């Protein structure tokens, strides 16, 4: 019985770690995309992009959107404008 419980706990922990890695990678890719969008089209385009994206999002993307919106789009834009590394940005919004 203890072995089964141990295996279940391990499996849950592994799945959570894997999901965390997926969310972190998705966040880093999104930050890079937003960085390019910000450079080309400006902050208003970033706000519009995130609004459109998060309006349709589900799954991991929905989770990431919740974190971004909770953190604040303007704060995200400031970090990106200040050339903060995507990993650090994602850590600040609790996606990594």
Swiss-Prot record:
It comes from the Eukaryota. Gene3D superfamilies: Saposin-like. Forms pores in the cell membrane of host cells. Has antibacterial activity against M.luteus, no activity against E.coli. Implicated in the cytolytic activity of the parasite. Monomer. Homodimer. Hexamer; formed during insertion in the membrane. Residues 1-19 form the signal peptide. Residues 20-96 form the Saposin B-type domain. SMART domains: SapB. InterPro entries: SapB_2, Saposin-like, SaposinB_dom. Pfam families: SapB_2. Its main location: cytoplasm. This is Pore-forming peptide amoebapore B. Keywords: Antibiotic, Antimicrobial, Disulfide bond, Signal. One of its GO terms (biological process) is defense response to bacterium. Disulfide bonds join 24-96, 27-90, 54-65.
